[in-house]
Amino acid sequence: MEDIGVTVKEKLTSKKDRFTQLTSLLKNEGFEVELICEDDFTSITFNTSNPDPIEISIQLFNDYFRVCYWDGYGVAEFYDYKNFSKAFKKFTKFLTKSKS
């Protein structure tokens, strides 16, 4: 079973370019964002005057990906996926939600 986790972890770190591209697109649209990429955690935070800004993240837990959304005011959502593509799709939907 540990081999599955390692494979998934490698997939997450190998997708850094996709998150970097999203960050660049957001910056081109005028948003101030910060990207954090680690082995088992990737997040994009919207830098605003709110002391607790919007954050969207993908975290690695054993053999699944947890996509989290924090709106900066008290609404938190998270979804778990075994497939990175589905998790990334949810991640981008949360980014779209954050832009409005």
Regions found by a protein language model. Give the residues of each.
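Residue-level detector of alpha-helical secondary structure
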Residues: T23, K27, S85-F88, T92, ...
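Negatively charged, low-complexity tracts enriched in Asp/Glu with abundant Ser/Thr
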Residues: M1-N50, Y73
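Alpha-helix boundary/interfacial micro-motifs
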Residues: F46-N47, Y79-D80, F88, K99-S100
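Short intrinsically disordered terminal tails
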Residues: M1, T96-S100
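Charged, low-complexity, helix-prone segments enriched in Lys/Glu/Asp/Gln
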Residues: K11-K15, F65, F94
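Intrinsically disordered, low-complexity regulatory segments enriched in Ser/Thr/Pro
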Residues: D52-K90
